[in-house]
């Protein structure tokens, strides 16, 4: 049995802690034979291979008496880069418990568990449902809406350095002014309406006018401004920080994709430039 979970890009401008989209990078968990103890085989750096692995901790949180198994973990989702690496593991752990424990969890139940563990739904929701998911959590009341993201390309600049979510959150203010809150809320409304209508030009305008978090976090990613400048000059819809960063995401049409990649490559920035596609499916299980 294999459990496959997509990467995610969350926040998307003013969609702070609320909006995320599933993208074409993946965590794959191969479930092998029962064992006397948990073993997670992988080639990742500084990640436990025993029961202390987040995958196993999550599964045991859902069902504490699961029989230990030998597992293989493969992932091309970079760690601490703002592409939902921890969320993908949490969602995989929930699905692992669901399968081994024969729990028959609904998607809603998976989202509730994942949100409790992660703290907010913006990454875990698209990892569960796929595509674009707009979510809210208010006093433990979780609502989510899955919709189709308009056809487009996501060009990711993935820096060689990590940026922990905790560090990225530390630069955020404790409060916003009433004026800024109203302005950013209205911009978020326009962004959501534009995405639902398929109007990526207006959506891009709104994405770049966030007041909730990007203006505080962008200085932590020194490459952001030049990437935004070049991408805008070459017809991108928007440039934004993916999740808490440091990945910089460029949203553009398929037609503009190659030109933007070519121009960004000329900058010789310290990182990788990768074109990602929208993943329409969330977590899935392949049984052999």
Curated annotation (Swiss-Prot):
Signal peptide: none
Keywords, comma-separated and alphabetical: Amino-acid biosynthesis, ATP-binding, Cytoplasm, Kinase, Nucleotide-binding, Threonine biosynthesis, Transferase
Pathway recorded for this protein: Amino-acid biosynthesis; L-threonine biosynthesis; L-threonine from L-aspartate: step 4/5
Subcellular location: Cytoplasm
Coiled coil spans: none
PROSITE patterns: GHMP_KINASES_ATP (PS00627)
Leading EC class: transferase
Family: Belongs to the GHMP kinase family. Homoserine kinase subfamily.
Name of this protein: Homoserine kinase
Species name: Streptococcus agalactiae serotype V (strain ATCC BAA-611 / 2603 V/R)
């Amino acid at each position: 049995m294999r459990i496959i979970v997509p990467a995610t890009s969350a926040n998307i401008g003013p969609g702070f802690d609320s909006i995320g989209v599933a993208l074409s990078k993946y965590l794959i968990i191969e479930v092998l034979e029962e064992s006397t103890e948990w073993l997670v085989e992988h080639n990742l750096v500084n990640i436990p291979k025993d029961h202390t692995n987040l995958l196993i901790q999550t599964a045991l949180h859902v069902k504490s008496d699961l029989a230990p198994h030998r597992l293989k973990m493969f992932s091309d989702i970079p760690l601490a880069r703002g592409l939902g690496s921890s969320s993908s593991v949490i969602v995989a752990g929930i699905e692992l418990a669901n399968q081994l424990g024969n729990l028959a969890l609904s998607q809603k139940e998976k989202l509730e568990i994942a949100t409790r563990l992660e703290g907010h739904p913006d990454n875990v929701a698209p990892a569960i449902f796929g595509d674009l998911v707009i979510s809210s959590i208010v006093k433990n009341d979780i609502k989510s809406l899955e919709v189709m993201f308009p056809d487009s390309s996501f060009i990711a600049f993935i820096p060689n350095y990590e940026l922990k979510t905790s560090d990225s959150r530390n630069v955020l203010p404790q409060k916003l002014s009433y004026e800024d809150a109203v302005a950013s809320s209205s911009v978020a409304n326009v962004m959501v309406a534009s995405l639902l209508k398929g109007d990526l030009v207006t959506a891009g305008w709104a994405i770049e006018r966030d007041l909730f978090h990007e203006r505080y976090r962008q200085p932590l990613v020194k490459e952001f401004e030049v990437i935004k400048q070049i991408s805008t000059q070459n017809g991108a819809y928007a440039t934004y920080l993916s999740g808490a960063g440091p990945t910089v995401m460029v949203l553009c049409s398929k037609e503009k994709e190659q030109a933007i990649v070519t121009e960004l490559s000329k900058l010789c920035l310290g990182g990788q430039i990768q074109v990602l596609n929208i993943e329409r499916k969330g977590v899935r299980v392949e049984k052999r």
